[in-house]
Amino acid sequence: DYLKDNAWGYNRVTDQTVRIVSLYAQNEWKNKKWGILIGGRLDKHNLIKGLIFSPRANLRYNPSENVNFRASYSYGFRAPQAFDEDLHIDNVGGTVSMIRLAKNLRVEKSQSVSLSADLYRSWGDWQGNLMIEGFFTDLADVFALKEIGFQDGVLIKERHNESGARVFGGNLEGKVAWRDKVQVQAGLTAQNSRYKEARTWSDEGGVEAIRKMFRTPDLYGYLSASYNPIKRMQLSLTGTYTGSMLIEHHAGFIDSNKSVETPDFW
């Protein structure tokens, strides 16, 4: 993957070549009640010293045809490289801001565990499904942005490593269908996203050190419904809910930088 970007007016040139060679293997054993999957991927990334091994495992148990339990584990990483969003040039309170990578940016690593239960049921012409899931992710050397000041009139945000973060919570999803006419599906997620150590997002005095991650609501969900009155016609209704979240409010309209909670919205 080759990425080259020249922002002529802002004295920024991005010239990056990414080469990844991967080897993937997995083995699965299953019968009607049990399923076990074990696998792993070996990656060689030209921006990372050495090889990275990413294991994964999945365990399934079906006590009956209508009940399905799962447990899974996975490991992942993000390389210290420029991503598409790093090329965006933002306007913050009338001031242009850009992202750059810290010189000593390290690999971000993650380990995730999840437990889930799927329940299925039929009542005549009706079918239903309920899924309950709990998840936990531990991030080491997690990427984060921090304002470090102005350079040639441009506000510089630097992507660097924090010590780590944890994300955990649960999902609840349900689906109900009547024949091939009506289908309703809804889901709700409650989660907690926190850095392991409090951090500030700006060097400006007065910005409080916090652990909560920005732009990560603790509650969000969705709803979708469809109705097929005739074979070639479908009526659809969709909606999403996003709970309150913490964001950075930059100086300009207000006197100084501060962190604020947004209202929830549909």
Segments (PLM) and residue ranges:
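Transmembrane beta-strands of outer-membrane beta-barrel pores
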Residues: 2-6, 31-33, 40-46, 73-79, ...
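Gram-negative outer-membrane beta-barrel transporters
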Residues: 30-35, 129-138, 158-251
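Outer-membrane beta-barrel translocator domains and adjoining extracellular loop/strand segments
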Residues: 2-12, 48-54, 82-88, 95-96, ...
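Membrane-embedded beta-barrel scaffold of Gram-negative outer-membrane proteins
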Residues: 62, 70, 104-168
